[in-house]
């Protein structure tokens, strides 16, 4: 006699995604019940296992005819139990309360049978094999026993039963003792905790790589800027530009290369606008290298890379520009110069409107007290934004941004534990930045139309084209 497959096949489970109806959850539950009934008929066709079966112990080799009711055999430790979710149910049934898998085939365990947690099918298979002293044809393939194929190789299935600790001497009555249930819950929680720790380690590694790329690719960062603005640098303090005379002096030294390209004879506002463009082009180059270092970005289609940078660079520039600003002015020329806010406000229109909105944003952004590790993740999330116009692989980019935003959230919780609303505040800044860039692009178009001497750099002209 052998344990053969039942002609009644279990129904294949349905995936939740296949059902869009709000009744899908209840429908799936009913299908699960039908599946369990079908399986029970197929696996247990030889008869039900009642109380009388628990009395039958004498035919097993080595049995002393006794019933073990309080101990587990060493091999039946639940150490290999996978990590299911522990529902907050008060039901004492092990299968429903802990959602434990069968140690043999991975199906849902119906209880604690023969020393291990097992499903009804594997419990019945083991009982029949022992009671009838069945001997199966030897198999050397070490078949993997799963729910879908557990009836195909009885030899390997029985060997799996023995290897996980099933024993006819380990029968016991009643519910799982509280002490064992607590132990099993603790084991499951430990497994879940270990899995969470592993995921956290991966996320921290991603955050570290992005932060390192940020420090590597940008000449100025917040740490350097704050030291200079606080007057704590060991080098000479920055040269202060507060009027036209000091501006001319700075143009001969600090930004000489920027004004040596045919704009020397232009008026001060035009020269200032030209210098702003030069600094923007340098930052775009740095941002491009930083983006390439973001894990997953280089795998994108080249067109998608260009699109993400086109729409993201100015949002990133104004974010990082905040680190160089305080309420009185901003650092320029890698921290060697400082131009006052008041001087910029006194430039003639429309040039006086260029920087003031950036100062307003910077004061609010700096109030969040972010450091470079926070800003690096924020800038990476800005660049990898899946809602930019014209993207091809939107799904991949959205997953890329989702991972970065998740790392950002965890990092903020760790780095700023007392500010529980910092993450939503930072997400709001993404919205503010889009508005800021839109207004800036509109102002640049006004300058381009009204100021004949204020030519746009070719790279920036390409970025602004069809931007907003």
Swiss-Prot record:
Q: Enumerate the residue ranges forming zinc fingers (NR C4-type).
A: 102-122, 139-161
Q: Where in the cell is it found?
A: Nucleus
Q: Does the keyword Hydrolase apply?
A: no
GO annotation, biological process: behavioral response to nicotine; cellular response to fructose stimulus; cellular response to starvation; circadian regulation of gene expression; enamel mineralization; epidermis development; fatty acid metabolic process; gene expression
**Name of the protein this chain belongs to:** Peroxisome proliferator-activated receptor alpha
Outcome of substituting residue 292 to A: No effect on interaction with PER2
- What function does the entry list? Ligand-activated transcription factor. Key regulator of lipid metabolism. Activated by the endogenous ligand 1-palmitoyl-2-oleoyl-sn-glycerol-3-phosphocholine (16:0/18:1-GPC). Activated by oleylethanolamide, a naturally occurring lipid that regulates satiety. Receptor for peroxisome proliferators such as hypolipidemic drugs and fatty acids. Regulates the peroxisomal beta-oxidation pathway of fatty acids. Functions as a transcription activator for the ACOX1 and P450 genes. Transactivation activity requires heterodimerization with RXRA and is antagonized by NR2C2.
Q: What's the subunit arrangement here?
A: Heterodimer; with RXRA. This heterodimerization is required for DNA binding and transactivation activity. Interacts with NCOA3 coactivator. Interacts with CITED2; the interaction stimulates its transcriptional activity. Also interacts with PPARBP in vitro. Interacts with AKAP13, LPIN1, PRDM16 and coactivator NCOA6. Interacts with ASXL1 and ASXL2. Interacts with PER2. Interacts with SIRT1; the interaction seems to be modulated by NAD(+) levels. Interacts with CRY1 and CRY2.
The UniProt record lists the keyword DNA-binding:
yes
């Amino acid at each position: 006699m052998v344990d053969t497959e039942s002609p009644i096949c279990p129904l294949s489970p349905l995936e939740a995604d296949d059902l869009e109806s709000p009744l899908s959850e209840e429908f799936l539950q009913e299908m699960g019940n039908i599946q369990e009934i079908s399986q029970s008929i197929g696996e247990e066709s030889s008869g039900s296992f009642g109380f009388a079966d628990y009395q039958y112990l004498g035919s097993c080799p080595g049995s002393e005819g006794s019933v073990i009711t309080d101990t587990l055999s060493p091999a039946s430790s639940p150490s290999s139990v996978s990590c299911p979710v522990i529902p907050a149910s008060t039901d004492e049934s092990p299968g429903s309360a802990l959602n434990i898998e069968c140690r043999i085939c991975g199906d849902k365990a119906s209880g604690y049978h023969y020393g291990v947690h097992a499903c009804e099918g594997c419990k019945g298979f083991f009982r029949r094999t022992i009671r009838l002293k069945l001997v199966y044809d030897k198999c050397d393939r070490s078949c993997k026993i799963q729910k879908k194929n557990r009836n195909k190789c009885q030899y390997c299935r029985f060997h799996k039963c023995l290897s996980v600790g099933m024993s006819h001497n380990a029968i016991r009555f009643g519910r799982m003792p509280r002490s064992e249930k607590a132990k099993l819950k603790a084991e499951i929680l430990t497994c879940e905790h270990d899995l969470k720790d592993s995921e956290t380690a991966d996320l921290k590694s991603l955050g570290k790589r992005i932060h390192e790329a940020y420090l590597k690719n940008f000449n100025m960062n917040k740490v350097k800027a704050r030291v200079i603005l606080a007057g704590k640098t060991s080098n000479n303090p920055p040269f202060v530009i507060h009027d036209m005379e000091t501006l001319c002096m700075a143009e001969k030294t600090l930004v000489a290369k920027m004004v040596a390209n045919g704009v020397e004879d232009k008026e001060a506002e035009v020269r200032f606008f030209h210098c702003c463009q030069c600094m923007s082009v340098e930052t775009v180059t740095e941002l491009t290298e930083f983006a390439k270092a973001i894990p997953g970005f280089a795998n994108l289609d080249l067109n998608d890379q260009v699109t993400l940078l086109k729409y993201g660079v100015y949002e990133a520039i104004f974010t990082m520009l905040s680190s160089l600003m305080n309420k009185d002015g901003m650092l320029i020329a890698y921290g060697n110069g400082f131009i006052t806010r008041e001087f910029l406000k006194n430039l003639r229109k429309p040039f006086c409107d260029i920087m003031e909105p950036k100062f307003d944003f910077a004061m609010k952004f700096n109030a969040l007290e972010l450091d470079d590790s926070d800003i690096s993740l924020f800038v990476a999330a800005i660049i990898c934004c899946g809602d930019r116009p014209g993207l091809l692989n939107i799904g991949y980019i959205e997953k890329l941004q989702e991972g970065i935003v998740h790392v950002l959230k965890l990092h903020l919780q760790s780095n700023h534990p007392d500010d529980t609303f910092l993450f939503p505040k930072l997400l709001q800044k993404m919205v503010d930045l889009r508005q800021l860039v839109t207004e800036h692009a509109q102002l640049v178009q006004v300058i381009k139309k009204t100021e004949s001497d204020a030519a746009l750099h070719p790279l920036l002209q390409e970025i602004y084209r069809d931007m907003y």
